[in-house]
């Protein structure tokens, strides 16, 4: 049924208090494994993104990238400016429960019920939320040890903005140069991670400045000292610091037992307008 037809039947057409959003759920009474990259940016229903749920009564293993809010699945893919999907990822799911995030009991003593994200893979979206629930463990960077685990990442990114969105940025000179990929996102979703056992992150020696970059200078008097306005931004292609809400939003992590080597970040981006003083 088209989304517009459903809104009409519910009497919600033109009512700004309601948001009608499609849902897609894949469930398994055993294990569930994602083996191919999913680019959800083309998954729109009457223009609306979906709430995508992957629920496994056993283990949920993500051996591929799950992405929305970007043009593609590569770390360097461009951030989009439209709304994006919300993601629900559940291992050890209680499939009989009304709550889509409900998990079976037992916690760390269980023999299954994990959610695992493989190395070099991403789970990300833009304006949607990421909700992850594991009856036992959440393993970020599964299949590797030491610093190699850091190559997996889970984050919300917000949506891309332009200077046209903000009249006060008239005269802003964007950063340029080799390797510069500036993005000033807004409207990012929340990240919520809950495990009955452990949350296992990836050891990272990465500096924040590797993915939160900056350009431009001013004097103490506020005069521009370069041709580029001072600004700082997110370089999504370089982000390898575990978990983040990179374009707004909150991060919440809870574990029934331990949290190991997990980095969680909530950065900002900014850009002032104006022109060099003559």
Regions found by a protein language model. Name each.
Residues 1-278:
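Low-complexity, glycine- and small/polar-enriched segments
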């Amino acid at each position: 049924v088209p989304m517009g037809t459903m809104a009409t039947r519910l009497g919600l057409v033109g009512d700004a208090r309601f948001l009608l959003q499609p849902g897609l759920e894949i469930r398994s009474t055993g294990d569930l494994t994602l083996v191919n990259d999913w680019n959800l940016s083309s998954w729109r229903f009457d223009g609306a993104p979906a709430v995508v749920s992957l629920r496994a009564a056993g283990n949920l293993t993500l051996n591929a990238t799950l992405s929305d809010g970007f043009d593609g699945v590569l770390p360097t893919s461009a951030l989009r400016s439209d709304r994006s999907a919300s993601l629900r990822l559940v291992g050890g799911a209680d499939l009989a429960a009304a709550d889509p995030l409900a998990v079976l009991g037992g916690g760390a003593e269980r023999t299954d019920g994990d959610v695992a994200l493989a190395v070099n893979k991403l789970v990300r979206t833009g304006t949607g939320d990421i909700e992850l629930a594991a009856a036992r463990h959440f393993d970020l960077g599964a299949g590797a040890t030491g610093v190699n685990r850091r190559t997996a990442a889970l984050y919300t990114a917000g949506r891309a903005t332009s200077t046209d969105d903000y009249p006060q940025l008239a005269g802003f000179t964007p950063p340029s140069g080799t390797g510069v990929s500036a993005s000033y996102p807004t409207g990012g979703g929340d990240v919520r991670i809950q495990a009955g056992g452990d949350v296992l992150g990836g050891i990272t020696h990465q500096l924040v400045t590797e993915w939160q970059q900056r350009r431009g200078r001013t004097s103490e008097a506020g005069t521009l000292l370069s041709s580029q306005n001072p600004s700082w931004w997110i370089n999504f292609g370089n982000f390898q610091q575990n978990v983040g809400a990179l374009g707004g939003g909150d991060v919440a992590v809870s574990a029934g037992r331990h949290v190991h080597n997990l980095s969680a970040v909530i950065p900002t981006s900014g850009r002032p307008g104006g022109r060099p003083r003559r």
